[in-house]
Structures are given as structure tokens and as C-alpha cells.
Amino acid sequence: ASTLKSGSISLFTFAYNLQSVPVGIIGTSYSVAAFPMLVKSFSQKNMKDFIGQISIAARQIIFWSLPIISLLVVLRAQIVRVILGTGQFSWQDTRLTAASVALFVISLVTQGLVLLLVRGYYATGNTKKPFLTNVSSSILVIVLAKLFIYIFNHNPEIISRLEILLRVKDVPGTVMLALPLAYAIGSIVNFIFIWILF
């Protein structure tokens, strides 16, 4: 992070907090609501009902997350400007934060599903697998962030394509987009591992 522009970590944190709202409202709500039924099904050794409860909650998380992803991608600059656009928060900061939000929401569905599957593990009394996969994915995020920062700093054509895609071509400090990109990829990989081990 020391190689990034001043204020990059703040922008990353703002974007992370914005994308955490739908994860908290949708993913956490459905996973917490499903937990008692998962515990009941597992204690009665009714695996068909257990998988059914996971399936119902997963469909609801996906159903509600997809429109929110669309809204966040399309209206990201407006949302960031309304919520954060006061005081010293410049238009360039708004654009970088909005681009970060767009990268974060790539993994919005998988973040919600991870919360659900972790509750499924907890319902069975298995806390080791989700702990190890979450630690592994956290390490992966750190490694990917360092790798992407290096790549973006040494390959201007790659960062240029990302800047064009996210419409931040003329904004300085776009290397910080390596952080939300690494987080999104790490979240997707975390979901894949938790799903495979489930």
C-alpha cells in the first residue's frame, strides 16, 4: 500500500463500506434466518431438508443480489457522489471510489453465498473448514493485491485497459484499483473452495 497514491486506502475503505451494505442486508439476513432451520435439519439427520434450506436461501440471495449489482454498476458514480461527495472529497475521488465499487460488486453474490455456506458448516458443528478457507483466501487476496500493484505499475497497457473499462482514464492513482480487484477475485475463489468442501 505504500506504493499507492496518498488517500488510496481511504477510497478503498469507502468503496468496501458501500458494497458491504447489500451484502449485510441480503447475505447476512438470509444466512442468519436459515441457520435455525439448518441446525434443526442436521440434528434430525434430515440431509434432504438441510440441502433444501441451503438451496432456498441461496436462490433468494442470488435473486436479490443480481438487481442490486446492476444498480450499483450503472449508478455507482451517483451513489458515491450522494453519499460521500462533500467537503474535501473531489470528483476524482468519486470516480476512483465508484470504479472500486464496480470491481467489488463482481463478487457480491459470492460474498452473500459464503455467509450462507459458513452458517451451513456451523450448523453441522464444522468450524475448521470455513476458518481455513477464509484464512487461505485472505492470504490469496494479499498476494493478488501485491501482484496486481506490481503488474499495474510495470505494464501501463494493462492498467490502461482497466481505466477505459471503468471510465477513469484521466484520473491519477488508478493503481489502487488493484486492491478491490484482488478482493473480488479472492472472494470468488473463497466461495469456490467453500462450495467444493461443503
Describe every region a protein language model picked out.
Residues 1-198:
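Membrane-embedded alpha-helical bundles of multi-pass transporters/translocases
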